[in-house]
């Protein structure tokens, strides 16, 4: 028998890495066990740990160092102790302050939130659970040190940097402020993982404990200060502030936040009563079928069904009655639903705002005080600044920050509404307002998110999220839009006339765009399985939008909406006589083929718009929402009730609700089992609704027996109309549009015979040979008729002159298919056009007659018939597909209907002394405009399709887009994390870095002096000489430079030098950061210019407008430009390096005669 091999111990961390990290933990002195005493090498140890975190964990995407530090209890055992020691004793010591700052730098990466994503390695799965639990311990240690005030100590470290004006603030100061805020954000994010075993009390790290700690240690005061001054003094800290606010308020009920103690106690009592009532209801339902002491013997019965089949049902409860037996049979049925692909779940727990969070009364009081102060002072500055940063796509903005922004705006708007509601209740109870609040409050405190820019941003975000199927982002956008609508509704009811006018203007802008209406409808119809939070948001948005739109349309009878559609330019009958070249023609054809957006205003009809919500998909969405009736509150149940009432009784589309599963749901809500609690206020309304629906169902079954079958299926529009009214909907047939006119590619054929052969071959390939034969017969009969007429007319001419012409011949056919083809078949129409057939009249509609004009002689008709017969007999002799040789024909007239010719308008004025007014147009046409337009078309040659013709984006494309956005987010996040180290925080001065800096400066000065000496000896610089030679190529070598060239070249040099700026990085927290000065070295690269042009949006964020260095650079460039201009004007000859020529006695060369062309001055470089 083989011996069992003992299991080997798996090393989760490389032993060498563990030994290196543990060797760094030696910065403390253990002589006194009762007091934490720093060792001499404490600062060096902290610096080494920081290097290991940055160079090992972040560079190799591992978590070994963080795991070792967690096992060694570095945070609670050392870093927090050092910060508390600094707070008590070392605030005046510069050395201790540097050590404390190094501790904060370590706390930020160690507390950075850990997310579970799809690209995790084995190492991540091994370390993340432990590190998540360790971070909870870190947070517990930071919050529990209230006596020492760890958070207050962190704020104290950043206060000196805050006090410095922005123009004098260095990169180190900005870095200190960033790590301070990121540490606060990490503390707000860290929560206990429900999947892991909790160590200690969960209340110590809960949201309530975090809020209380932030209030007690002045974190809320810091946030208020930064938010209210974010646009002026702290413009790079808006995103961390937004994230802190989001993680502080997500999931908290706004209504409970602004309740007083009595209301909160009553609310809590009602919730407890509801839970007890649900429990008693569940017990009653269970007691109906619960086993008794006597029911110890099994029971099995046979049930004979209507189709003479037998079914087996077991259990004594089936003996009670027939209904119970059938219900037991239904419960035993199992539907083998087809399995689909596993749905990709969003595992980012830290950004979930659908899960409700409960906080303690003390935390509620503290948070309410902060929210009120934030609404009064910091709401507008912060959210306006964040919105602008998101619109600019700043490098510091991640994709998740848009979701943070939208949800936080919606939450604070709801808080403002709740605060006003509580104030009104307080005033109603007291009977009068306080003396300091005699005037009603204006909505100016939240006006920063009620402007047109926010609406444009919100609509764009909703549309992008809907197109890319980013459901969480769309959920946040819908919540934001709903709160904006509710806020505007309250503004319209404000006693201030100014607020009423603003609300009227906002509603007009929101409801004016029909695209907004269509988007709301598409969101409601597109629900599948996005979760209850998304379902709640989309149903609430549609309910609020419909209700407000109905009220607004009633008060504004003449309401107009703007509908946008894509339309194509209609073909014009007349064509321009003069045609351009083939290339020009192709470009113009593609230009005319592009679909353009057309805007059209029309009167709004609310009944017509509400009818769009009367379809089966919208009903299914609200049915899915109603299935959660046991968990819904009164407002949500009322929302669903109002929708079904609108469908059944306002829109008269009751048949949409006549489906077995919907009727079963409504019956179960009222009668059970597991029905709605009858004590709820909304129960009576639901009961009456269900009763009326059942009554109408019975009547409808008597009128329409076919409804019995249709109860099993969803109703399409035609079926619903028939079941409702008893007859099919009458549709009015409209005349069809003529097909697009075709033409033969001029490159493929030049003679009429070749064109006819190509068209005949195309018809034959499309199996339309019968049409070609019919046309041949028409030509033959027309030739015979025309020949007889010509002979007869010849005899008449011999007798005497006549004035009559040859009669026209109508193209007729007894076959209806040929008649339809004359209008619908574009190739047949092209063939008749090439044969010089004409249409009677100018209208191109179905049924119009084609004729053979009198100008065509019998010989011409016979020649055309011979060509067609030959092409039909021989077939296609070309290897190319004849269909590829045909193309659409477009009119070359201007699309706006303007003829393009200049009007002979005279703008002469006698007051200006004009005696003779020239004839003709005042401003002749620009002969080069057409060429520019063609070049632009060639560069932007892209055909757009109609929205209805666009194919839906498949899942693979969406997944590729998601992966691209995810990679971009990870790159930005990695940049933020890797830069979260304060530059020069370890030392105020670095001798090695200074020595390297001075050495480089010495080399640059030496190179510059050599270039100056060489320029003085040669009379020019090498680069300038090369440029001058290139510029003067083809000219006489002895021709002197004219003033225009000198001035132009100087301007070009100044322009190129002006773009040579170093963009400051968004996150400047980097070790050993160098800012090379390219201006001093005189080197400039075109790649740098391209990079600068591509990052103009980022440059707006990174450039501090109060930075003296930034303005100093601009002033230096301006002064240099002014000096050059002055020197050029004063000195006759000036070299490129700015030095005057040594030969001052050389006579000045006379200026060249200015060249004139067509009355315009032509400079030397304008060729």
Swiss-Prot record:
One of its GO terms (biological process) is DNA repair. Residues 332-353, 563-594, 889-969, 981-1093, 1105-1167 are annotated as: Disordered. GO terms for cellular component: replication fork protection complex. Residues 572-582, 959-969, 996-1013, 1110-1127 have a biased composition (Basic and acidic residues). Pfam families: TIMELESS. Residues 1078-1088 have a biased composition (Polar residues). InterPro entries: Timeless (IPR044998), Timeless_N (IPR006906). The keyword Transmembrane helix does not apply. Keywords: Cell cycle, DNA damage, DNA repair, DNA replication inhibitor, Meiosis, Nucleus. It comes from the Eukaryota. It is found in: Nucleus. Involved in chromosome segregation during meiosis and DNA damage repair. Belongs to the timeless family. This is Topoisomerase 1-associated factor 1. It comes from Emericella nidulans (strain FGSC A4 / ATCC 38163 / CBS 112.46 / NRRL 194 / M139) (Aspergillus nidulans).
